Amino acid sequence: MSAILSADDLNDFISPGLACIKPVENFPQKNTASEENAYEVTTEDKIQPENQAPTQISLTDCLACSGCVTSAEAVLISLQSHAEVLNTLDAHRPAPLIITQDGNLSVSRKIEPDERIFVASVSPQVRASLAATYDISERKAGHMIDQLLRGPQGLRNGGKHGNGFTWVLDTNVLRQMVLTLAAQEVTEALHTSSASSGSGKYTSPKKPILSSACPGWICYAEKTHPHVLPHLSRLKSPQALSGTFVKSILSRTLGIAPSQIWHLAVMPCFDKKLEASREELTDAAWSNISDSPVRDVDCVITSRELLMLASSRNISLPSLPLKSLAPTYAPHFPDPTVDSFLFSHTQTSKQSSKYGTSGGYLYYILLLHKEKHPGSRIEVQRGRNSDVIEYSLMSETNEAIMKAARYYGFRNIQNLVRKMKPARASRLPGANRRGAAGSGASSSGLDYAFVEVMACPGGCTNGGGQIRLDDAREANASLHSATPNDSAVTTQKHTTYEQRQWLSRVDEAYFSAESDSEDEAKPAATGSSLHDMEIRTRDILQYWTNLTGAQLEDLVYTTFRKVESDVGKDKNVNDTTRVAELAGKIGGGW
């Protein structure tokens, strides 16, 4: 464990402060009804209290402030949860979609403002968690989620309007876009200087490039280690990219506003709710006609909340048909080219444990560069623990072509960012020379071309929103007749060994995802298949930009910012005076 790691760093959530430091300057205006008599005198004891609207601080405000919230999981559960999904399904009428027997979709009339099209994106880690819970294959877990979200025996079987999700997407498909662009980003960094390059708001990252798909890591970096921000990859995560992809294409092909498309993401991590609430991830980034920004991902729920979603509608997940839906409930995407990309089983390749449980960014980049250097080999060296692994791509002559690393867990992340921290310039005479001599050790992390960084130890299959062992026991116990002994089993505490065994089951389900698919007869991905996927992905990226008329950078890139707190700092007297004047105008004061 790092010597500077304190107990406070082990839990990065701080309860919201009693007094939010964000000033509220839009005070409600006093209601002066026309029937009131201006000359009437009312004694103080007869004055009726005014029902003023409560002050609201949005999650976007919290993300722009480091005063009280550093990990908003507890707050987000009430803002983005299974209850919000059900309330939204009941609050809006279904869009007038006509789906034929063969799955072709058309719109019968103009979609009204109060009507919605519902789309969901599901991560492979969620399917793995569900597969381990009910002891089924990852493929059947996908069918289970499909049947729940858009099948006739799922959410459509209840609610005010009988709403369900029209499309359920696999984020693995969008992940292939991110992998292709990440490999390109690293290649460009290897052939340029260490300084940031590029123009506009999307500046190319410096080496070592740090992955930016983990929102817990991003929140931590923005608030505590701004010196690593120039190293963060510009790419959106698969979740964010799926929201942009769905809303930009559907709004264009169906001629509707992005606000009429409601996008749900089912993820393994509570911090993904933070990511969905970022002001950078709205249609304002890629749409020129957006007056009021609409989030690309409207709601995020976790694997555990998926169980709660089914329980709220009294739906037994194991009782659902574990098979593909009929075309009437699984329509084609309006655009044939996009439909082929989203729902083709040949888009993603089989991944081994070498890829890791967080999308395989690092190993994919290594394989592509290995393909460019015939005869090269990948050497693996374990770090101080199992969550730190260093990789070296070596040539035939035993020369290092590139180095990369994997850092999982905040304990290891702190060691990484400490290595990358720039050395302070000393004022002592002759100190600069000694500092330069020792700069290699302090900047050893800069030898990497790419670092895959994830906040959770073990990767995304161990996300905070995944189904726990006791949750799985309770879910399975509810399938049988409850007895006193059974209830005792579900409430007993599990050991560390049992927890590790449970995580191993989830990992096994994750890595066996493709082995039980319809294409299991196909061999594992080779260099040529990786090259083919690269070509298909670049073709669909070009098609996407042509279809929407947006720049590719605006569709796939995002930005990050340094978050500073005003707590403990001298406040601007002018601002304080202005707020006091506003308070005085409504009869208040300090």
From Swiss-Prot:
GO biological process, one term: iron-sulfur cluster assembly
Keywords: 4Fe-4S, Iron, Iron-sulfur, Metal-binding
Binding site for [4Fe-4S] cluster 2: C214, C269, C456, C460
Gene Ontology terms for molecular function: 4 iron, 4 sulfur cluster binding; iron-sulfur cluster binding; metal ion binding
InterPro entries listed in its UniProt record: Cytosolic_Fe-S_CAF (IPR050340), Fe_hydrogenase (IPR009016), Fe_hydrogenase_lsu_C (IPR004108)
Lineage: superkingdom: Eukaryota
Residues the record lists as binding [4Fe-4S] cluster 1: C20, C62, C65, C68
Segments crossing the lipid bilayer: none
Record keyword Ribonucleoprotein present: no
Family label: Belongs to the NARF family.
Summary of the function given for this chain in its UniProt record: Component of the cytosolic Fe/S protein assembly machinery. Required for maturation of extramitochondrial Fe/S proteins. May play a role in the transfer of pre-assembled Fe/S clusters to target apoproteins.
Annotated protein name in UniProt: Cytosolic Fe-S cluster assembly factor nar1
Annotated organism of origin: Talaromyces marneffei (strain ATCC 18224 / CBS 334.59 / QM 7333)
Gene: nar1
